[in-house]
Amino acid sequence: MIALLNGQLIEKTVSQVILDVGGVGYRLLIPLSTYYALPDEGDVRLRVHTHVREDALLLFGFLTETEKDLFGLLLSVSGVGPKVALNILSHLPAADLQQALSQGNAKHLATVPGIGKKTAERLVLELREKVGPVQAVPGNAPLPAETAGDLREDALSALVNLGYKENLSRKALDGIDTAPDAPLEDILKQALKLLMR
């Protein structure tokens, strides 16, 4: 089983990356959190979950061991496959997911598109004891808080890299109302909603 890949980033889209490792190109499916955190080029290291099916071998890449472990836990729940697990991690940061599971907050889990009330309740029922309380994990500690201006500039850069014009991206960012401590993912989600109208 492949557990870790360290190589040159060849291609990056919102759902997958291609890494060149020793002349071999590996395609890894990724959550949005990994997409936003990866550089556009250069060397990257991803933790890998290898998923084997009868007809395919799928690789899923994560920046942190915590995300990889949560992905594996989500797959252990009946009715949750790789696409659903990746969707959950794309919409909920790892700490939020851990907190929702450990506190039995099925309502918060049901805010993820494609996750209904029954699935959310099943996730809580099967994973609540496995996740335990949220703790700071070495290597996954949050980085120092960025200023709101830095986050806006990062969001602008991400939108331009996605192909949106800079002036339209600035208007979208100016048109959203986010909390001063809102994470980059939330800022981008709201801006993308405006840009897709």
Swiss-Prot record:
<comment type="subunit">
    <text>Homotetramer. Forms an RuvA(8)-RuvB(12)-Holliday junction (HJ) complex. HJ DNA is sandwiched between 2 RuvA tetramers; dsDNA enters through RuvA and exits via RuvB. An RuvB hexamer assembles on each DNA strand where it exits the tetramer. Each RuvB hexamer is contacted by two RuvA subunits (via domain III) on 2 adjacent RuvB subunits; this complex drives branch migration. In the full resolvosome a probable DNA-RuvA(4)-RuvB(12)-RuvC(2) complex forms which resolves the HJ.</text>
</comment>
<protein>
    <recommendedName>
        <fullName>Holliday junction branch migration complex subunit RuvA</fullName>
    </recommendedName>
</protein>
<keyword id="KW-0963">Cytoplasm</keyword>
<feature type="region of interest" description="Domain III">
    <location>
        <begin position="147"/>
        <end position="197"/>
    </location>
</feature>
<dbReference type="GO" id="GO:0005524">
    <property type="term" value="F:ATP binding"/>
</dbReference>
<keyword id="KW-0238">DNA-binding</keyword>
<dbReference type="GO" id="GO:0006281">
    <property type="term" value="P:DNA repair"/>
</dbReference>
<dbReference type="InterPro" id="IPR011114">
    <property type="entry name" value="RuvA_C"/>
</dbReference>
<keyword id="KW-0234">DNA repair</keyword>
<feature type="region of interest" description="Domain II">
    <location>
        <begin position="64"/>
        <end position="142"/>
    </location>
</feature>
<dbReference type="Pfam" id="PF01330">
    <property type="entry name" value="RuvA_N"/>
</dbReference>
<comment type="similarity">
    <text>Belongs to the RuvA family.</text>
</comment>
<dbReference type="GO" id="GO:0006310">
    <property type="term" value="P:DNA recombination"/>
</dbReference>
<dbReference type="InterPro" id="IPR010994">
    <property type="entry name" value="RuvA_2-like"/>
</dbReference>
<dbReference type="InterPro" id="IPR013849">
    <property type="entry name" value="DNA_helicase_Holl-junc_RuvA_I"/>
</dbReference>
<dbReference type="GO" id="GO:0005737">
    <property type="term" value="C:cytoplasm"/>
</dbReference>
<dbReference type="GO" id="GO:0009379">
    <property type="term" value="C:Holliday junction helicase complex"/>
</dbReference>
<dbReference type="GO" id="GO:0009378">
    <property type="term" value="F:four-way junction helicase activity"/>
</dbReference>
<dbReference type="InterPro" id="IPR000085">
    <property type="entry name" value="RuvA"/>
</dbReference>
<keyword id="KW-0227">DNA damage</keyword>
<dbReference type="GO" id="GO:0048476">
    <property type="term" value="C:Holliday junction resolvase complex"/>
</dbReference>
<dbReference type="Pfam" id="PF07499">
    <property type="entry name" value="RuvA_C"/>
</dbReference>
<keyword id="KW-0233">DNA recombination</keyword>
<comment type="function">
    <text>The RuvA-RuvB-RuvC complex processes Holliday junction (HJ) DNA during genetic recombination and DNA repair, while the RuvA-RuvB complex plays an important role in the rescue of blocked DNA replication forks via replication fork reversal (RFR). RuvA specifically binds to HJ cruciform DNA, conferring on it an open structure. The RuvB hexamer acts as an ATP-dependent pump, pulling dsDNA into and through the RuvAB complex. HJ branch migration allows RuvC to scan DNA until it finds its consensus sequence, where it cleaves and resolves the cruciform DNA.</text>
</comment>
<dbReference type="InterPro" id="IPR036267">
    <property type="entry name" value="RuvA_C_sf"/>
</dbReference>
<feature type="region of interest" description="Flexible linker">
    <location>
        <begin position="142"/>
        <end position="146"/>
    </location>
</feature>
<dbReference type="InterPro" id="IPR012340">
    <property type="entry name" value="NA-bd_OB-fold"/>
</dbReference>
<dbReference type="Pfam" id="PF14520">
    <property type="entry name" value="HHH_5"/>
</dbReference>
<feature type="region of interest" description="Domain I">
    <location>
        <begin position="1"/>
        <end position="63"/>
    </location>
</feature>
<dbReference type="GO" id="GO:0000400">
    <property type="term" value="F:four-way junction DNA binding"/>
</dbReference>
<dbReference type="InterPro" id="IPR003583">
    <property type="entry name" value="Hlx-hairpin-Hlx_DNA-bd_motif"/>
</dbReference>
